[in-house]
Design a protein with these regions (language model features):
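N-terminal Rossmann-fold NAD(P) dinucleotide-binding loop
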Residues: 13-14
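C-terminal catalytic lobe of FAD-dependent flavoproteins
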Residues: 164, 292, 332-415
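Dinucleotide-binding Rossmann-like beta1-alpha1 core, especially the glycine-rich loop
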Residues: 44-167
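Active-site substrate-recognition segment that forms the wall
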Residues: 45-46, 51, 55-95, 221-232, ...
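Helical element adjacent to the flavin cofactor pocket in flavoenzyme catalytic cores
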Residues: 148-160, 179-244
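Short beta-strand to alpha-helix junction loop
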Residues: 103-116, 139-149, 174, 187-206, ...
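Beta1/beta-strand and adjacent pyrophosphate-binding region of the FAD-binding site
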Residues: 1-10
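Glycine-rich FAD pyrophosphate-binding loop
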Residues: 22-41
Length: 415
């Protein structure tokens, strides 16, 4: 049995630890914060095979150019002189070509479906303590232009074997008996599911603790020691830790951590915001993405979460209240009588999504070291891809045949 250190206690790191433990490894998790403060905790809670189009696509570039200089738009890049951002931006632009997007759809589709199945297995094994519901997800639209685009996407989904159902405005309203819905129509993806991400993380965390997995929380990585082609030790502000293998899954901090090993990663942190309203009297029945405004709406039992935006402004940037107000305004535009009020600032959550330039994650070994696995860059799909990523990481560490071809996720594809 080998000892494996997992750096990162978000949903990606926790799922890696879960599968490594199941694979018979001794596992130690090191996390810079605690389990409930990371990006995974406040996200929309989707596990979405419907999201088979990579972030880097011709559509997002066209829209992004319109949006990027408005601080209240769904996509915003804070103008600044930053060499890493410039490198990332140029690569993102190149990888957004249609030819690259079409090449990346099959592996993204495969890992999404693998993860969807594995998420159900985790629920079946640990119990549904994280409020997982399998009612699908709506893509709702208000304009004819967006309707045309979403119906074209539905046809692409069908070609991949993904079921879709197209609804007019009346059909959407019938699916939401408690609230008025102001839309032109929507596309439902029945395969999608949703859950409470914080509850999922707590469920896995408590399970691993009960099995003897060690957690070192509020512990910052300061460096590593190497012996030949192996990482031998991780140095932290709480002491040093040795292991046979190391998995780095530190989210938007991944390139900061890998620099200690001389590894440069193209990755930017994209900030997203969410608000969670408790005990909503007349709540949504269906999760939905408000496509024209890029806002996600997720009922979580009697609670309701709304979130969105992609703000590339650096890890030290403050909250932009305009962006949160834009999310709330969009929600009220689609659901005029939704019984919620704009929250106070302390109830607004934000976190950072780690963005690779092509929208695909980094999963695999780095050629500089025989015992190092990187896992990051999942963008808005961290929860959707967490279970599959954890499974693949365990297979890589164990020297097993992976459940799918991971060539597209090569951690050195931009070298």
């Amino acid at each position: 049995m080998s000892k494996v250190i997992v750096a990162g206690g978000g949903v990606i790191g926790l799922c890696a630890a879960y599968y490594l433990h199941k694979g018979g490894h001794e596992v130690v998790v090191i996390e810079r914060g605690d389990i409930q403060t990371g990006t995974s905790f406040g996200n929309a809670g989707y596990v979405s095979p419907s999201h088979f189009i990579p972030l880097a696509s011709p559509g997002i570039v066209a829209k992004g150019l319109q949006w990027m200089l408005s601080s209240s738009s769904p996509f915003y890049i804070k103008p600044r002189l930053d060499l890493d951002l410039i490198k990332w931006g140029l690569t993102f632009w190149r990888r957004s070509a249609k030819s690259h997007m079409e090449k990346n759809i099959p592996p993204l589709n495969e890992i999404l479906h693998l993860s969807r199945a594995l998420t159900s297995e985790i629920r079946d094994e640990l119990g549904n303590h994280f409020r997982m519901e399998e009612v699908g997800c709506f893509m709702l639209y208000k304009s004819a232009v967006t309707e045309k685009h979403e119906i074209e996407l539905a046809k692409e989904a069908a070609a991949l074997g993904i079921e879709t159902k197209i609804f007019d405005a009346k059909g959407v309203q019938e699916m939401e008996p408690e609230v008025e819905v102001n839309v032109r129509g929507g596309v439902l993806y029945p395969i999608d599911c949703h859950l409470h991400p914080g509850d999922l993380m707590q469920t896995i965390y408590q399970y691993l603790q009960s099995k003897g997995v060690q957690f070192h929380l509020n512990t910052t990585i300061e460096g590593f020691e190497k012996e030949g082609r192996k990482v031998s030790k991780v140095i932290t502000d709480k002491g040093d830790f040795t292991a046979d293998a190391f998995v780095l899954a530190t989210g938007s901090w991944l390139p900061i951590v890998t620099k200690h090993l001389g590894i440069e990663l193209l990755l930017q942190a994209g900030k997203g915001y969410s608000m969670t309203f408790e005990n909503v009297e007349k709540n949504l029945h269906q999760p939905a993405i408000l496509v024209d405004d890029r806002v996600a709406m997720t009922p979580m039992g009697t609670d309701l979460r709304m979130g969105g935006t992609m703000e590339i402004s650096g890890l030290q940037s403050p909250m932009l209240i305009k962006r949160v107000q834009a999310i709330f305004k969009a929600a009220k535009n689609y659901y005029p009588n939704l019984p919620v009020s704009f929250p106070s600032s302390e109830k607004i959550w934000w976190g950072w999504r780690p963005l690779s330039p092509d929208g695909l994650p980094y999963i695999g070994r780095h050629s500089a070291f025989d015992n190092l696995v990187l896992s990051g860059g999942h963008a808005m799909l961290g929860l959707s891809l967490a279970a599959a990523t954890g499974k693949l990481v365990e297979e890589i560490v164990g020297g097993k045949k992976t459940s799918m071809d991971i060539t597209a996720f090569n951690v050195e594809r931009y070298n």
